[in-house]
Amino acid sequence: MRMLLGTFAALLSALAIASAAEHHSCDIPDYLLFANNELKRVTAVVKNDHRLTIVVFGTGSSALAGPNGPASAYPARLQDLLKQRLPGIAVKVVPLVRSRQTAEDMAKGMEKLVADEKPDLVVWQTGTIDAIRRIEPEEFRSALDEGIEILQKSGTDVILMNMQYSPRTDIMVALGPYADTMRVVAQQREVPLFDRLSIMHHWSDTGAFDLFASGKDDVLASQVHDCIAHGMAAMILDAAHLRGNEQKPAQ
C-alpha cells in the first residue's frame, strides 16, 4: 500500500508539471464548468459585505513545491484572479492541505474548519486517497454527505472538486466509481462540481497538456495550476451570478 501511495503521488506530481509548452491553452468546454447549482452565500457576502473567504480543503495536489510554489499554486492564483475580477471586494483564499486523508477523515474536521476559518465557500477536493485505498463507494458517498451536510447547515457554500487525470494512473487506480459518486452527490446536494478529472482529460485529448510527459519544470506546473484557477474562478462567478471584470488566461 505504501509503495502504491508513493508511486501514485509521484505520478500526480509528474502530471502536474507536464504540458505542451508551445501550445498552452486553458480552454474548458462550458458544459464542464457551468450548471444550475448556485452559490447563494457567495452572492450575498460579496454584494452586502464586500468580502469573500474561500477555503480550499483537500489533498496535496492543491500545493506546489519550491520557493515559488505557494504563490504559483491554484489557491493563490484563484485569490489573485478573483481580486482582479471583483474590484473592491476583500478576497481571501485559504489552502488547508490534508495529505493522504480520505473523505471520511476530512468530513470529521469540517466543524472545526467552519469554527476556525469562518468560510463563505469551501472547495472540497477529495476522492484520490479513497480510490487508492479502495474504500467502499457507499462509505465514500456517506462521508461526502456528512461533510456537505455540516457545511450547508452552517450556511457555507460548497464546491466539490474531484481527482486529477493521468493516462498512467488510469491503469493503476480505478478512479471512475469515485468520480461518478461525486457527480451523483453533487447533483443530489445541489452543489457545483469542479470536474477536474474530465477537464484534465479534455486537456490531454486536445493536446493542451501532455499528461504522459514528466519533468521538473516549475513553469509548466504553474501553467497547469493557473488553468485550474481560471476555471474555478469562472465557475464561482457564474454560480454566484457575479459579473466580474473579464480576464482571459494567457495563451
Walk through the language-model features, giving the residues of each.
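Positively charged n-region of N-terminal signal peptides that target proteins for export
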Residues: M1-L4
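Bacterial N-terminal signal peptides
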Residues: G6-A16
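Boundary at the C-terminal end of the N-terminal hydrophobic targeting segment
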Residues: A18-H23
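Serine-esterase "nucleophile elbow" of acetyl-processing enzymes
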Residues: H24-L96, K112-K118
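Internal alpha/beta domain cores that form substrate/cofactor-binding pockets in large enzymes
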Residues: T53-V56, K83, P87-E117, I129-L160
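Solvent-exposed loop/turn segments at secondary-structure junctions
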Residues: G60-A63, R98-E104, G127-R133, Q164-R168, ...
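Active-site segments of SGNH/GDSL-like serine hydrolases
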Residues: Q125-T128, I148-A179
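Catalytic His-Asp segment of secreted/periplasmic serine-dependent ester chemistry enzymes
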Residues: Y165-Q251
